Amino acid sequence: MTNTAENANLCGLNRKDFQTTINGKKTDLYILRNRKGYEVAISNYGGAICAIMVPDKDGNVANVVQGFDSIQALMETDEIYRSTLIGRYGNRICKGRFTLNGKDYQLATNDGPNHLHGGNKGYNLRVWD
């Protein structure tokens, strides 16, 4: 990870390490910061929070999340929901089935017999525009 003037940030993440194409969509890293020294680094792949930099009471800035240092690390993690968006539904839908307005729906099951956090194509696996 290198920090150049072009991508200077507190967390030391390099935007180029987050730039690739997944299913025809470009991924990137976005840095949000305020005047008080807070900084959040978010990938548009899964909406993953890669770093949150905040100062302590003495003004020392530190990362307070276990994030990712590249798009590759994010894509290869075994903890697929860590720091990412979940959905359409958060938690489990028993046996992946539910009824809405009298109509029965069967969802993909990805947690044993259950549907978890949006299933096999949840928000954590999407590239957000």
Q: What feature does the model see in each segment?
A:
Residues 2-129:
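Surface-exposed acidic/polar loop and edge beta-strand patches at domain peripheries
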